[in-house]
């Protein structure tokens, strides 16, 4: 009987302890692997979100730069320097100001209740993109009163008033498509616009172009630098973002990720 019980005996205490240790090591290894993969995945998705936010804004500006100067064939609105297709006011970069762009193009409205021949009326719109200091609190600095170093991009749309020969106030112009400054994107580090003529030369000055050269802009380089909202890297390091504008490189010793997006928009309605 003793021999039979011996042959079906379970694990000894030592064997059980060894099994527990091995299982614990395996679980620790699996958790470590998961943490590494999860951290890497989170970094990749965070980077993608930051880049996508910048690309969405640049794509929007690009489409409207292409609209600059557009008018309908029978447009009868008197010409004015206020209707210059593109006007770029230069900034100096992070810590001070971004570039500002104003884009003007024509529109048309149809009133089926009007008499034939008077059913169409022409309009003029101005789109403006400009930066203002960000109002987000920097939670890495004690006190809760320090703002982050950066900007928020705002967009506005105004309609031309042919009676007063001025841009109307969106709050009182009865046009539902116009609006005053609306925030489009925050955590912006810089926004740059560089106009070029047909020979590929930079049109200098601020604002640019001048009234006499208003229709000489053939393309505009658009560049934006966007920062992550939270620390991205594990440790601080000096990282530099090279700007397309002279003297506006961004060098920061911190943990934030910055992405630069640059595109070229052709002003297809100018010089036609």
Task: Give, region by region, the residue ranges found by the protein language model.
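Hydrophobic, aliphatic-enriched repeat segments that assemble into extended interaction scaffolds
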Residues: 57-58, 62-65, 101, 212-224
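Acidic surface patches and DE-rich sequence motifs
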Residues: 7, 73, 197
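Surface-exposed loop/linker segments characteristic of extracytoplasmic
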Residues: 82-198, 219, 262
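Residue-level marker of positions within ordered structural domains that often coincide
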Residues: 35, 66, 70, 108, ...
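Aliphatic-rich helix starts adjacent to a transmembrane/signal segment
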Residues: 2-4, 8-70, 272
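Exposed loop/turn and edge beta-strand positions of beta-sandwich/beta-sheet ligand-binding modules
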Residues: 16, 123, 213-216
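Short, glycine/small-hydrophobic-rich surface segments
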Residues: 65-100, 205, 237
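Short linear sequence signals and composition-biased patches located at protein termini or domain-edge surfaces
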Residues: 94, 171, 176-272
């Amino acid at each position: 009987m003793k021999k039979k019980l011996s042959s079906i005996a379970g694990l000894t205490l030592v064997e059980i302890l060894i099994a527990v240790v091995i299982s614990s090591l395996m679980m620790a290894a699996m958790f470590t692997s998961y943490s590494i993969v999860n951290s890497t995945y989170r970094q990749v998705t965070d980077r993608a979100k930051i880049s996508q936010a910048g690309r969405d804004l640049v794509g929007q500006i690009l489409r409207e730069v292409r609209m600059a100067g557009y008018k309908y064939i029978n447009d009868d609105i008197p010409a004015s320097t206020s209707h210059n297709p593109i006007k770029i006011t230069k900034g100096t970069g992070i810590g001070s100001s971004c570039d500002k762009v104003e884009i003007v193009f024509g529109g048309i409205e149809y009133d089926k209740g009007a008499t034939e021949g008077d059913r169409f009326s022409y309009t003029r719109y101005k789109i403006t993109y400009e930066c203002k200091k960000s109002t987000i609190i920097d939670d890495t600095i004690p006190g809760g009163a320090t703002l982050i170093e950066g900007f928020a991009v705002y967009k506005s749309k105004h309609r031309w008033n042919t009676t007063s020969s001025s841009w109307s106030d969106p709050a009182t112009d009865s046009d539902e498509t116009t609006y005053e400054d609306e925030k489009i994107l925050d955590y912006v580090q810089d926004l740059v616009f560089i106009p070029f003529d047909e020979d590929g030369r930079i049109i200098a000055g601020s604002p640019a172009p001048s009234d006499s050269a208003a229709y000489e802009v053939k393309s505009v380089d658009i560049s934006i630098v966007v920062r992550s909202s939270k620390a991205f890297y594990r440790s601080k390091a000096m990282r530099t973002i090279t700007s397309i504008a002279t003297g506006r490189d961004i060098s920061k010793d911190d943990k934030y990720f910055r992405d630069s997006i640059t595109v070229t928009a052709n002003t297809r309605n100018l010089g036609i």
